[in-house]
Amino acid sequence: MYIVNLILPLIGSIITGIFGHKLGNRISIKIAVGCMMLTAISSLYIGYEILLCNSVVHFKLGTWMQVGSLNVEYGLLYDSLTSIMIIVITCISSMVHLYSMDYMKEDPHKTRFFSYLSLFTFFMMLLVTADNFVQLFFGWEGVGIMSYLLINFWYTRLQANKSALKAVILNRFGDFGLFFGILLVFLVFKSVDFSVIFTIAPFITEYTINLLGYEVNAITLIGSFIVIGVVGKSAQLGLHMWLPDAMEGPTPVSALLHAATMVTAGVFLVLRTSPLLSYSITILNILTIIGALTTLFATTIGIVQNDIKRVIAYSTCSQLGYMIFACGLLNYNASIYHLTTHAFFKALLFLSAGSVIHGLNDEQDMRKMGGLVNLMPLTYQCMLIGTLALTGFPFLSGYYSKDIILETSYATYYWEGTFAAIIGYVAAFGTTFYSFRLLILTFFNKPRMQYKTIAGVHEASTNMVIPLVILALCSIFIGYVTKDFFVGLGTPVWNNSFFAYPYNNLILESEVLQRELKLLPLFAFIYGVITPVLFYFNIKEDRMINVKQNLMVKESYFFFVKKWYFDFLSRVLIVVPFFHLSYDVMNKNLDKGLWEKIGVTGVATTLVTAFTALKLKNEITLSTYISYIVQTIILIIVVGIFSFMTGFIYMELCIIIGILYICLPSIKID
């Protein structure tokens, strides 16, 4: 069951990708969707065995590589964390597969699309089921490659090419960090297996590594590189620029990769390595600060976006910040709780946005929409449910998971927790503001489309509606149903998954917070709804003119539109200097400059010039050529003996090239 659960997406990908043109589009796509549905069902069964029966399944499949003391084996680890992740991955992926059957119906390359989706699911499952760092890194790189291929699926579009390259290059920085973190793990622990590393970790908390003459705590140094990987993959502040641009791919790709699964790989990495990272207060503080700042940054940028998919993308970035700073405060169960609920309502939002885009002939600018509430009522209801769940409307899934993060953050009573909680409350208001702004601009007011566009607006087809309805039901009920399971006091589910200090029982502390603090998210929701209604519902110029003329509003708006100048600063301080270094210095002056002059080209040119001059001075006769040939043979023998004795081959080749160039009578001098 466990191995079948892992390889079914791979089988679907191979059949669709390799044999799709022989089987036909319809049959091959049905095979891919069927494999994904079976994978989701098997994941639910595995979840029953692991989660409800409170067991762990760990088995080895054989040796992968053995070099010296490095022994890497194929192994699968199914604990509570893995079970939750594979349920989320396979359920969302199966819904996206079903949705894409109609969404990509007119695309001539749809079999390739389904093959990519299934292969991505396989790599994601390989990542979360790995029992060692090397296997995890293999899955980590696999999802990065598939992200590039799926963003660039419409490869004839220049913007898709740029976005895919931007995503893969920025993720290289994160992959570089994780790679060096794995090297340090092997250096310190002499193993890459999680079981060995986590067993030894409590005994080396004081172990140090000499780095450039300074003694650095080993766990802190390893954690620093792991954090770089987390920041890259989960689009945290500093390496976040790729996520909004990744919206150039098809909308189902955005729902699967950039909302529910791939971007949560960084959060999963923190949770998986929690028995190691929990011993470094420095790393935990860094995670808290980065997550909180990412939440604030993404919220402020989302307020001023006009592309419907980019608004949801920045919302994803913001919610990932919540998960990361919850991990930094050792509140791991709340983090995985929010990850699970977020996956369902964010996939719902993206797929609902896809239905809107599909119905409006690929229009994504919210300023060119409006009045769709009567034309697409079912899509509106699904979008409304997803929006309410995201903003923390009482008794929907986001209400439980996000509130528990905010309450437990404040309940730490350390400055890091207070800092994260304050930013979280502010971001809760901002999230509600831009979510209802999206809802109002898209579905209310007068239609702002052309008449022919309005005439062609239609509700989504059955295959697109079914996933929306299922995800909407999950967005309503899954938070309430699983609350005690994830964050209930005394729940045994996480005993074998991640580690936190025993005294760090934040659930009890959050239950005795002041009433005002518990009501803050509700007030943030109320004000977040009222504000966009006042400004955007039945827009009137006299209502907006004073706001638009306010200098502070103008400057803030410009600052947010420029994305805090991150793109500008990264281009000026990193991209342009590295471009000049690589092109002007390394390429023009060294590779095609100095090295060519003193290297093969320069030596060959010098010899050609010298022998050409000699050739012009002498009379070209048969005896001259015979003399050159004899001299060449003697020179080759001498140089060969010299090369054999010294091992110096480079100059020998240069001399032979030059001499043969002169000796061949076919050479003509113009």
From Swiss-Prot:
The chain crosses the membrane at residues 1-21, 31-51, 81-101, 111-131, 133-153, 178-198, 211-231, 251-271, 283-303, 311-331, 339-359, 375-395, 421-441, 462-482, 519-539, 566-586, 594-614, 629-649, 650-670. The keyword Membrane applies. Keywords: Electron transport, Membrane, Mitochondrion, Mitochondrion inner membrane, NAD, Respiratory chain, Translocase, Transmembrane, Transmembrane helix, Transport, Ubiquinone. It holds the Pfam family Proton_antipo_M. Its main location: mitochondrion. It comes from the Eukaryota. It catalyses: a ubiquinone + NADH + 5 H(+)(in) = a ubiquinol + NAD(+) + 4 H(+)(out). One of its GO terms (molecular function) is NADH dehydrogenase (ubiquinone) activity. Signal peptide: none annotated. One of its GO terms (biological process) is electron transport coupled proton transport. GO terms for cellular component: mitochondrial inner membrane; respiratory chain complex I. Its EC number is 7.1.1.2. It is an enzyme of class 7 (translocase). It is a multi-pass membrane protein. It is found in: Mitochondrion inner membrane. NCBIfam families: NDH_I_L, PRK06590.1. Belongs to the complex I subunit 5 family. Core subunit of the mitochondrial membrane respiratory chain NADH dehydrogenase (Complex I) that is believed to belong to the minimal assembly required for catalysis. Complex I functions in the transfer of electrons from NADH to the respiratory chain. The immediate electron acceptor for the enzyme is believed to be ubiquinone. This is NADH-ubiquinone oxidoreductase chain 5. It comes from Dictyostelium discoideum. The gene is nad5.
